[in-house]
Amino acid sequence: MDCFASLAMTGVWTDQMPRFVLPLLLAIAGLILFGQGGYIHAKALLAQVLLERAFTETIATGRETKPWSWADTWPVARIEVRRIHASTIVLAGSSGQALAFGPGHVENTPDAGERGVAVYSAHRDTHFRFLRDVAIGDEIDVTRSDGRKFRYRADSTSIVRFDASGIDPLSNKYELVLSTCWPFEALTPGPDRYLLHASLIGPVS
């Protein structure tokens, strides 16, 4: 039971508080929540600008380029879904710091275009928010840090527990998995993951 409900039930709220206080407090609470959400999205957008610059430099120079001096990761790929105009830069590794600023290339999975299952993970409310709009049959382009681009076709989705994905990164197939938390609209962390599976079409010249 929250404090607003308990006060109202005892009559303290309605009898001793001015009528404008409740709407005012609700408005303040809303601004705080909106501000927190706005900060998260603003950080995500700013990070992608810096990551895009670092990724462009990485392709041009062939050297790992950090997006900012204190970063412990660097951009390794760009994921694009042209039909829905979605694009995001991927960072090396899936640590908490990496995922705070962009999708992460999950450790011990191959690069896009290589044999096996390349896995990229990101938060559902920022960088992989667009996954809810990806349809079966959509083409997904992944550009690596060496400048090579590979095209995949989305062919299925699944809901799995985080510790029981069933993904075999050493598969003989050429596949891509984009992973995020499930359900999309949840406000608290949970054990389930949404997986978008895609099969390699081939390199893009």
Predicted regions and their residues:
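Solvent-exposed, non-transmembrane regions of membrane-associated and secreted proteins
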Residues: 20-205
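Generic low-polarity alpha-helical segments
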Residues: 6-7, 164
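Hydrophobic beta-strand core residues of beta-sandwich domains
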Residues: 5-6, 134
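A cross-taxon signal for low-complexity, glycine/charged-rich
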Residues: 1, 7-13
